[in-house]
Amino acid sequence: LGDSYLSGPQQLFKRFTFLLSEAGAAREQAKKESLLRGAVRELEKLRTLVRRGSAYLTERLEAKAGEPDANPLYDALGGVRKKEELEALGLTLAETALLQLAFEVRYDEAKREFLDLGHWISLSDGTLYREMNFRPLSAKNYIAEKDSSDRRLRAERFPYYPAFPGEAARIRLEDATAEQPEAADFARIIGFAAPIAQAVKQAAKALQSVLAEDKAPALLQLSDVAVKEDAVYLRDAAGSLL
């Protein structure tokens, strides 16, 4: 169909059918139930996106609006934004520096795609952002793999993408200058860390949005970390446990 379909709903449907297929082949009951819960979650996302996306597109058509707006539904439906479009919408982070807190590589079997995911923090206000580099298997020889970074990044403007309430926005870092971080930067980051109760409250708010990312990053203020068998236990100064 070329450009005559919306890639966002298609990807959700692919993941839904993939999880159903995996659940049917699973022998362990616990794994089967986990896969089925995941399939239901994808179906819930698909239903929500169809309902909200249809209303959004109808409104845009009636208004004869052809240019992308700052609604994250545009991205969820599969819209692709250029850096210049983000800047034109005023979606830029200015006069700040960023440091990476964590880095991971995920693989989505349903999409047959790797995701290099960097979690960054603004040294100005402690806001968390995500750098996302998508690498489909079909284009693995043409898209460079990202790596972790221990440098402070600075730019005149960092463009970022619209996000659902409470969700860490995706940010673009290609025009940034890398610098050696200072001790004061790490002290500032520690000052932004939240106690467990506050972080859980913020994460719960982010996860209320069906179309938002399933995982909510948080910078925790901890006093103890313990590992027992396959579980990690966290405690903060107030005695809260996670």
Map each language-model feature to its residues.
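Helix-loop junction hotspots and adjacent acidic micro-motifs that serve as functional foci
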Residues: 1-242
